[in-house]
């Protein structure tokens, strides 16, 4: 899941 920092989960 791409979220704002801090990244929670995998960055795709």
Curated annotation (Swiss-Prot):
Cell compartments where the protein resides: Secreted
Gene Ontology CC terms, in alphabetical order: extracellular region
Coiled-coil features, chain-numbered ranges: none
Keywords linked to the UniProt accession: Amidation, Neuropeptide, Secreted
Residues that bear Phenylalanine amide: 12
Highest taxon listed in the record's lineage: Eukaryota
GO biological process, one term: neuropeptide signaling pathway
Family in the record: Belongs to the FARP (FMRFamide related peptide) family.
Protein name, entry field: SIFamide related peptide
């Amino acid at each position: 899941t791409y979220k704002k920092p801090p990244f929670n989960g995998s960055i795709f």
